[in-house]
Regions:
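Patatin-like phospholipase
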Residues: 1-45, 57-308
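Gly/Ala-rich beta-loop-alpha elbow adjacent to hydrolase catalytic centers
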Residues: 47, 51
Length: 308
């Protein structure tokens, strides 16, 4: 497998799939291409939002099935918003609230759940509502934070968190859930970006999109007294960088494809992913997102990509 000057992808011990809706098909194409060239998935995987489902498809070797199911569901869906049948077009909700769970069921069944249990460790992030009485305030703050956090490159160290007012980041493990419906619910919760996908109740508590709190998962203990620990040192030697690798779904023009930020390793798309994040109709270009991922993986394997 390809090495660059400071990085050997075979040394990655934890692979993180960030969220991004349909942009996560770039991750699917990228990793599927690496696997086709002989790479083996690390045994510790973390997924956020749609990235969690993509990770599950790669673990269970159902990525093609998941992509086909997505395209079929989108082809049968007339629009982003669902309307009540009748003469008056009364909106009743967002289509993804039905499409997304149906998509998960199309490629994650009992056999696939057994593969996830036998794989190693798959965790998905979600944002748990801690104070129901402040639900509206917590969600509004989370949405604004999420929009601000899209450009996490410019965030200061103190702006990363695993807890904000009313919400806490939690790691859910589908392999520990039984029956299958409860395992699927962890993936639904991780992508529950209200109002597009409604919150999911797990163990009596409401859970929302994992990306509401942080654009990338923040592990317990990474922040002490508002400061990052040594593994997030900005001056970390590239040769000693973390063996954790995060696959982004946004393109930052000031960064190369492979880069370090606060001591963490990231791979980003070579350009803006050509797909609508929340699109769910026949004209949603998920194939283009997947294809860009494949092309970027091929470029990654055959060229020397220097970190900053």
């Amino acid at each position: 497998m390809h090495n660059n000057e400071h990085f050997n992808i075979n040394n990655v011990s934890t692979l993180i799939f960030s969220g991004g809706g349909n942009r996560c098909w770039w991750q699917a194409g990228f990793v599927a291409e690496l696997i086709s060239q002989g790479w083996t998935l690390p045994k510790d995987i973390i997924g956020c939002s749609a990235g969690a489902a993509i990770a599950a498809s790669l673990i269970t070797d159902t990525t093609d099935k998941a992509l086909d199911a997505c395209k079929h569901l989108y082809a049968d869906n007339p629009g982003l918003i669902r309307y009540k049948r009748g003469a008056l077009k009364i909106p009743v909700g967002f289509a993804q609230n039905e499409v997304y769970p149906n998509w998960l069921k199309a490629f994650i069944g009992e056999e696939e759940l057994a593969k996830i249990r036998a794989f190693g460790r798959l965790r998905v992030t979600a944002s748990r509502l801690d104070r129901p009485s402040f639900r509206l305030v917590a969600i509004m703050r989370a949405i604004f934070r999420h929009l601000h956090g899209k450009d996490f490159i410019i965030l200061g160290q103190s702006e990363y968190a695993h807890k904000i007012a009313g919400l806490s980041q939690v790691f859910l493990e589908p392999a520990q859930r039984q029956p299958l419906s409860e395992a699927l619910q962890t993936f639904e919760a991780s992508a529950a970006a209200s109002p597009f996908i409604l919150a999911r109740r797990i163990a009596g508590e409401l859970h929302y999109d994992g990306g509401y709190i942080s654009p990338i998962p923040v592990f317990p203990g990474e922040r002490v007294g508002g400061n990052f620990q040594s593994d997030l040192n900005l001056n970390l030697d590239p040769g000693e960088a973390s063996t954790t690798l995060t696959l982004l779904t946004r393109h930052f023009e000031t960064k190369p494809m492979l880069f370090s930020h606060y001591g963490k390793r990231f791979i980003q798309p070579s350009r803006k992913i050509p797909v609508s994040t929340w699109g769910c109709t026949a004209d949603t270009t998920v194939d283009d997102a997947y294809g860009l991922g494949q092309n970027d993986a091929q470029h990654f394997l055959r060229t020397s990509i220097l970190t900053n």
